[in-house]
Amino acid sequence: MSAGLETFALKEEDAIKLLACQTHVGAANCDFQMEQYVWKRRADGIHIIHLRKTWEKLLLAARAIAAIDNPGDVCVVSARPYAQRALLKFAAHTGSTPIFGRFTPGCLTNQIQKQFKEPRLLIVSDPRVDHQAVTEASYVGVPVISFCNTDSPLKFIDIAIPCNNKGVQSIGLMWWLLAREVLLIKGKMTRQTGFVLDDKEIMPDLYFYRNPEEQEKEELAEPREVKEPWPGVPPPEVAKIDEVVRSIGMYQTIGGVEPAKKLDFSMVEPVSDWAQETERAVQLDAAQQQEWGASTQNSNW
């Protein structure tokens, strides 16, 4: 289909990427409608996908996506955990609407639902896993583009891109290639510049799934560089602690702690003997009672 145009021909670099990510490795089973995309079958029963046909269907899907005037009318769906990162990157670069995770039934058919959408085109990662979205798209007449393995059913699929849709690197590479071809057809990039957006080169591994546990292990395994402070300048940790200590009224220096200042008790009354104070209070009370009694006897009622 694209053999006459050198611009859209399969390059050696892209073919190496497809082989390195095992995009050509299919499944042991093969659907009768997917036999046209199979090159041959290995001795262990695994079907090998014809990469030239994969590339041709990828270009056809890119042309269909680029034909939509409003990129937001293109809806991308994936329920596979390791395809959601690629899906979000594709949506960010092309402007399409992502639906990742579980697809809520009625999202395309139930108009009173909060998540109701009316897309003009639907793209899924696996027609078997995302069967709910494919079925609802058939009810409302929305065309569907799907990445299909050799054992994937093609019912309600308008454009099937044969590839290994179960591999972590394979599915990420296919989303990356699809986004690149869409932007190329729209004229936002060229073959000479490569996949460059906002002066940043978009590499295929940006679309690959990354396990959070492995990321934490890599961060812990990386050696951290300890920068030596300038002479006479305290390290940032010590300077921060010193600032906090000074803010609460205590004075701490880098070399040690300054001696505590003596408190001035001249304004405080000296503490007296509590026993003497008690006896004095009792005597004053008795004297007052005697005065009250004398005034009562001498008073003339």
Curated annotation (Swiss-Prot):
Chaperone found in the keyword field: no
Database matches in PROSITE patterns: RIBOSOMAL_S2_1, RIBOSOMAL_S2_2
Keywords, sorted A to Z: Cytoplasm, Ribonucleoprotein, Ribosomal protein
Record-stated family: Belongs to the universal ribosomal protein uS2 family.
PANTHER family tied to this protein: 40S RIBOSOMAL PROTEIN SA
Location within or outside the cell: Cytoplasm
GO biological process annotation, one example: ribosomal small subunit assembly
Protein name, entry field: Small ribosomal subunit protein uS2
